[in-house]
A protein has these predicted regions:
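Polyanionic/metal-chelating signatures
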Residues: 143-282, 415, 421, 503-507, ...
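Edge beta-strand at a domain terminus
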Residues: 410, 508-554
Length: 1009
């Protein structure tokens, strides 16, 4: 007796102590019960690697107390016999907007908004509204009963929530899906930090591009570091304060496609941050590069629906990338797992959360191991946010967050009966539903009423009423415990509904009904045949899904295998060397290890070399396009008058089909320029056209150039009436932009030089790192070259005089259609001209352009290049070079140099490309005719010894592409015939960028546009 009283007293003390820890009063008596439940005779999946057969799970006060085969149950425990059912940890979603307010952008009256250069956010926050480090999800979290119920229904118990707005989004909060107050749901108010490439609802003009987003984020990291080490900073900045507090938390980066994953990781590498990256579902397309990031991924589960290709004209607009992604996307997780890349799943982005398990099971069908799928939903997400001591498995001391299922979680017909969150039960389906399935003889008011067929599952029966032997009616039905309610219209000719309510007794349903005329009558249904369960498919014999190959790049004309450098002997060709040897007849060239090793006659083939007969053909170095905008996701950052901080290398698009098309025209390298939206543009990128290679393999990192611009674009002449805010608005103002920025860059460089020269460096005294001024300081130090968009003589003279006075060098004037007027001044200063062959009169700025421009500059000693600035023109740059022979009598060899050696000189890469010489890169083109002829076509184009375009193989590729398209179209037609959902075809035309093009970043580019 004394022992019982002691135990009771101890329980009261614990209960009272628990109450004492609560700060919220309760209206009424406190419920002192401990919520002690034991779930026995269950298959308990403790974690993906541990399963207990016929085990017991004991929970108490919202926590797991014990788990195992032999569990001693305390007195007063409520025992639930699960009779072999399964228990799993509740699921975790790391990318949720549950309970978060919707971010809404203010719309200006009349739909026209004056450019907003500065932040309009009130308070001592940072200068850019897209940086929202101060956002604290825990302060704006409000439980949403409906959304919580929807998530619990598919098995989730905990979610990581954050505000999905902005580039830096602040900190996330870990919350449970209880139906109680936020105070109960909140597990960790500062669980994570969140980032994206979308500026969200910010109405500021900057950034206006993805590369601008990257630059802003990089600068924010540098500013936060400076702010933290500089106690005497001249400003208070709550955004930087908050950023320094959250940057040590697990950092999540939301992206939209495979290249954004790589871009995010590149930012993280610069600052020693390993982001956890939410992908776009196309990671399989660049799996090796993504694995090299060592990032953990968050994978979406919204797979593309088949396109409705019934109409062949509709089918024609679908790209190969769209077709292939539809086929391969469900296997993304399987391929990620096979590559040993850790990942978690998210339900974010799903059109219908009810399709969650359908997508998971589809991923399993495509080869994803069940253990990996469970890990991606439980233990791994818990470990990523350092919450494995609270959630993610069924171990003592963790929250009692678990689900009870009918069987294996990944089985086709599995049912989730209950979801327990913090020890509280939420019923999703009746756990011991009576099995009333079968065929019944229906009698209403002692008269035959047809048949009642009940199929489906015990938990979710499916009903059919059969009248007049053949007419099947689907009634409205509600089964609660053993009480059944049916309502249906028995005869369409008679208005009204028959309503039946009854209960199960043995094998008979009986009760009372109401006829359409209002009469109350008895009814019953007698079981005549038990439901015959269809045998489940043997999953061990299911064949893996057959899919086509992954292409590199993942578009039409992509390669199944990337070309490799070959050892070649090209014999008896007419070789245009671009060297002092000139044009060699019947000459040989040897290529080894990506380099030209020998040039001469009657050369012996190296061991293992493939011999190419060049008889009657011309061999040249590859064409170099000095001014190009291909292979980019965006080209202008026009949010400010200077965007020297942005880098075109951050937005290189290796999937652009123009790479392949230009290889077909003999182009092997392109200089990718920022557009002409502002006076000081972004840092350019030079790429080799290695079709199918990664971004890093294409970009030449040692080529450091930058785009400047003059003229009407930079002063926003054609941007509309509202664009009257950004400086400069006149050509006079453009001059002051250059003076202002370079004078500040001089002072900036001077301050760093002074700091670096001190013997004892104190971090607090270091200047603030400014990546915009870094680029300009490199120009002053001759470490970065300027290519300047230019048309009018007066402005060109202005910039040359500014450069003279500030002691920096202009490398190249591009366009330069009035270059013939000042070629002597350009030659004197060593400035090159990269121009069009014969474009003129297409706008007022070029009204005095002439087709003899290139020749006149050449004759004055200017290094002249012919460029494209156009994806289509670049396919025929050999013909553009030929025009200089027509207009001005430029010698043929010199004309050819204008698209090969001269652009190499202007880009300072003539030591490795631009001519055929031993030791240079084997970037070669074999033409079927004189390269300046309009009839000339490349037989093959190689880059560093690898053939990336071969005309014969191209013909074969076109045939195989057509066969692959038709195969995929037939698969889509089969999907539609089987009743699966389809979507309307959407044309996916690649963007053809030009200097003036602007694209916003309120939403990031998608991978399959």
């Amino acid at each position: 007796m004394f022992k019982q009283l002691s135990t009771l007293f101890s329980g009261l003390v614990v209960s009272i102590c628990c109450q004492a820890q609560q700060t919220f009063p309760q209206n009424g008596a406190y419920d002192e019960r401990p919520g002690r439940y034991a779930f026995t005779n269950a298959t308990i999946v403790v974690d993906p690697k541990t399963t207990i057969e016929n085990g017991t799970l004991l929970i108490e006060n919202g926590l797991i107390s014990q788990v195992g085969k032999q569990v001693k149950l305390p007195a007063g425990t409520v025992v639930v016999d699960l009779k072999g059912k399964y228990i799993y940890p509740s699921l975790i979603d790391l990318d949720s907007d549950y309970g978060m307010p919707e971010a809404k952008r203010d719309r200006p009256a009349g739909g026209r908004q004056t450019p907003q250069l500065e932040s309009n956010k009130k308070g001592a926050f940072g200068w850019n509204q897209a940086i929202q480090s101060e956002n604290d999800a825990s302060l704006i979290f409000t439980p949403d009963a409906k959304k919580a119920a929807d998530l619990r229904k598919i098995g989730f118990g905990t979610v990581l929530v954050h505000s999905h707005d902005g580039i830096v989004r602040g900190n996330g909060a870990l919350v449970t899906l209880t139906d109680e107050a936020a105070n109960k749901a909140l597990l960790n108010r500062k669980a994570s930090a969140h980032f994206s490439f979308s500026k969200g609802i910010s109405s500021q003009t900057y950034p206006s591009s993805t590369m601008g987003v990257v630059a802003l984020l990089r600068q924010n990291y540098y500013d936060a570091e400076w702010y933290a080490r500089t106690p005497k900073a001249k400003e208070a900045n709550l955004s930087l304060d908050a950023f320094n507090q959250i940057k040590t938390l697990p950092s999540f980066f939301e992206t939209g496609d495979k290249y954004s994953v790589l871009r995010a990781d590149k930012v993280g590498d610069e600052f020693g941050v390993q982001y956890i990256i939410k992908g776009g579902g196309d990671e399989y397309q660049r799996i090796n590069e993504i694995k090299a990031t060592k990032a953990t991924l968050i994978l979406p589960l919204q797979f593309p629906e088949a396109y409705d290709v019934t109409d062949p004209w509709d089918a024609d607009v679908i790209s190969m990338a769209q077709l292939k992604h539809w086929e391969l996307a469900p296997g993304n997780a399987s391929l990620v797992a096979r590559a040993q890349i850790p990942f978690a799943f998210t339900s974010a982005g799903m059109k219908n959360k009810a399709d969650f398990w359908k997508s998971i099971k589809t991923a399993v069908e495509y080869g994803l191991p069940k253990e990996k799928a469970l890990e991606a939903l439980t233990t791994l997400p818990a470990s990523l946010i350092k919450a494995e001591g609270q959630i993610g498995s069924l171990k003592p001391g963790l929250l009692a967050n678990f689900i009870i299922t009918s069987g294996d979680l990944f089985d086709k017909d599995n049912i989730i009966y209950e979801n327990w969150v913090q020890g509280k039960k939420f019923i999703l389906a009746p756990i011991n539903a009576p099995d009333i399935r079968g065929t019944y003889l229906l009698t209403i008011n002692n008269q035959p009423g047809g048949k009642l067929e009940i199929a489906g599952s015990p938990e979710k029966p499916e009903y059919k009423v059969i009248v007049q032997d053949s007419v099947k009616i689907t009634p409205k039905a509600i089964l609660s415990n053993e009480l059944l309610t049916l309502s249906y219209q028995a005869d369409k000719k008679v208005t009204g509904t028959t309503r039946l309510t009854g209960w199960l007794t043995g094998t008979t349903l009986s009760g009372e009904g109401i006829l359409p005329n209002g009469a109350a009558v008895p009814w019953n249904a007698t079981l005549t045949q038990k439901f015959q369960q269809t045998a489940a498919a043997d999953t061990t014999t299911i064949k893996p899904k057959e899919t086509g190959p992954i292409l590199y790049p993942f578009v039409g004309f992509g390669n199944e295998q990337l070309p490799k450098s070959e050892t070649l002997l090209i014999k008896n060709a007419t070789v245009w060397t671009n060297e002092k040897e000139g044009i060699l007849q019947n000459a040989d060239v040897i290529v080894q290890n990506g380099k030209i090793t020998k040039v001469g006659k009657s050369l012996a083939a190296p061991s293992g070399a493939k011999t190419v007969d060049g008889t009657g053909k011309h061999l040249t170095s590859g064409i170099i396009d000095e001014h190009s905008h291909i292979a980019l996701f965006t080209i202008n950052e026009g949010g400010q008058t200077s965007s020297a901080e942005v880098r075109m290398s951050d937005v290189v698009n290796p999937d652009d089909v123009n790479i392949y098309r230009q290889l077909a025209g003999g182009v092997t390298a392109s200089h990718l320029l920022h557009g002409s939206a502002n006076s000081i543009g972004g840092q350019s990128a030079m790429i080799k056209l290695k079709w199918g290679a990664s971004q890093s393999e294409m970009v030449l990192p040692d080529v450091k150039t930058i785009k400047f611009a003059l003229g009407e674009n930079v002063k926003q002449s054609n941007w509309g009436d509202v664009a009257r805010v950004r400086f400069p608005q006149t050509r006079m103002g453009v001059e002051q932009v250059y003076f202002d920025h370079f004078l500040r860059a001089k002072e900036y460089a001077k301050s760093w030089k002074s700091f670096n020269s001190t013997s004892k460096k104190v971090a607090a005294n270091a200047p603030r790192r400014d990546i915009e001024l870094d680029a300009l300081a490199e120009i002053l130090d001759n470490q970065r070259s300027i290519t300047c968009h230019s048309y009018v003589q007066s402005e060109i003279n202005m910039l040359m005089h500014v450069a003279d006075s500030l002691k920096f060098k202009i490398n190249t004037f591009t366009h330069i259609l009035e270059g013939y007027k000042l070629a002597d001044g350009m030659a004197k200063r060593g400035i090159g001209g990269s121009t069009f062959a014969d474009w003129w009169a297409y706008k007022m700025e070029v009204k005095e352009a002439i087709p003899y421009n290139a020749a006149l500059m050449y004759h004055q000693g200017v290094t002249v290049a012919i460029n494209s600035d156009d994806a289509e023109m670049a396919r025929r740059l050999n013909q553009e070079a030929a025009k200089t022979v027509e207009y001005g009598g430029v010698p043929e060899e010199e004309a050819w140099k204008m698209v090969t050696l001269n652009p190499a000189k202007l880009l300072h890469v003539d030591n490795r490309m631009g001519s055929i010489k031993a030791g240079k890169d084997a970037d070669l083109v074999l033409w079927n005719a004189h390269p300046l002829s309009i009839y000339a076509r490349p037989e093959f184009t190689m880059v560093e010894g690898a053939v990336y375009f071969d005309r014969k193989k191209d013909e074969e590729k076109q045939k195989s592409m057509q066969q692959e398209r038709e195969k995929l179209i037939q698969k889509m037609l089969n999907d539609k015939a089987e009743g699966k959902p389809t979507q309307k075809p959407q044309a996916a035309q690649p963007k053809m960028w030009h200097c003036e093009d602007i694209v916003g970043v309120h939403t990031e580019h998608e991978g399959h546009r």
